[in-house]
């Protein structure tokens, strides 16, 4: 207030740049009643009819993709079995909407028992925040490198979408160990169903700092529309083909 008053005495206009979190709180609008200024925080859009529309879109799209991609699933399964020992699929506990645990499925892209070796390479982590990422992860198999380059290892998550555990578009499902390190505001990203792809995945993928990923997730939640989901899915295609930021 003192700064504003000083500007007024100097006949200068006062302007300021809010924090990034203030900017993405796009549900905030200003109004006034009988001259009294009010700030309104609008409800998140993903409930009721909108939630029904999103789930319907997920169910239809995942059903079609399962049928259309079945031949590709078979080819990938054979490739994995020929390349290294272990199962075709890899399942991992993740945290979904509301903090609920579920099993996420992927095509196996690492050697069998890779999770047990994570402590040996923990000091090589290249990501900030609670996420663990290494560009040249020694646990990745030959076939796994190809699958990860084009995000083909993520395809079994379509079954997670079909069963209602995930959505086609939404925040990335975190590991339980990641959630333990969350700050309070990070939990906002788990107010909706987690997804296969999302806003930050088409805005830089693994190259983005952790907090920027979270901010993009929150922006998505607060500005959701079915058209936004479709746009993100369409933008995911060239991002996957270019393999930009994938590792």
Roles of regions detected by a PLM:
Residues 1, 47-54, 137-144, 176, ...:
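Alpha-helical membrane and juxtamembrane elements of multi-pass inner-membrane transport
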Residues 18-22, 28-31, 89-138, 197-215:
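Short, glycine-rich, amphipathic interfacial segments at transmembrane boundaries or analogous
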Residues 26-27, 114, 178, 185:
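Short Asp/Glu-rich motifs
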Residues 130-193, 232-240:
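A short, structured surface patch at a secondary-structure boundary
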Residues 218-221:
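Acyl-group handling in specialized metabolite and lipid biosynthesis
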């Amino acid at each position: 207030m003192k700064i504003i008053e000083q500007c007024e005495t100097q006949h200068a206009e006062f302007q300021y740049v809010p924090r990034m979190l203030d900017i993405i709180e796009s549900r905030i609008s200003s109004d006034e009643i009988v001259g009294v200024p009010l700030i309104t925080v609008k409800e998140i859009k993903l409930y009721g009819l909108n939630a029904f529309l999103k789930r319907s879109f997920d169910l239809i799209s995942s059903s079609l993709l399962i049928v259309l991609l079945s031949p590709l699933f078979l080819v990938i399964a054979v490739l994995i079995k020929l390349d290294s020992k272990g199962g075709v699929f890899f399942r991992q506990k993740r945290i979904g909407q509301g903090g609920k645990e579920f099993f996420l499925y992927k095509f196996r892209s690492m050697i069998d028992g890779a999770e047990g070796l994570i402590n040996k390479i923990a000091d090589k982590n290249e990501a900030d925040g609670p996420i663990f990422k290494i560009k040249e992860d020694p646990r990745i198999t030959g076939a796994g490198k190809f699958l990860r380059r084009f995000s083909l290892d993520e395809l079994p998550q379509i079954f997670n979408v079909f069963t209602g555990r995930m959505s086609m578009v939404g925040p990335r499902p975190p590991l339980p160990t990641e959630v333990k390190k969350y700050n309070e505001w990070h939990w906002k990203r788990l107010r909706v169903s987690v997804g296969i792809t999302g806003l930050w995945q088409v805005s830089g993928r693994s190259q983005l700092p952790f907090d920027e990923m979270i901010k993009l997730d929150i922006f998505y939640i607060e500005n959701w529309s079915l058209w936004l989901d479709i746009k993100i899915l369409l933008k995911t295609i060239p991002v996957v083909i270019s393999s930009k930021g994938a590792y």
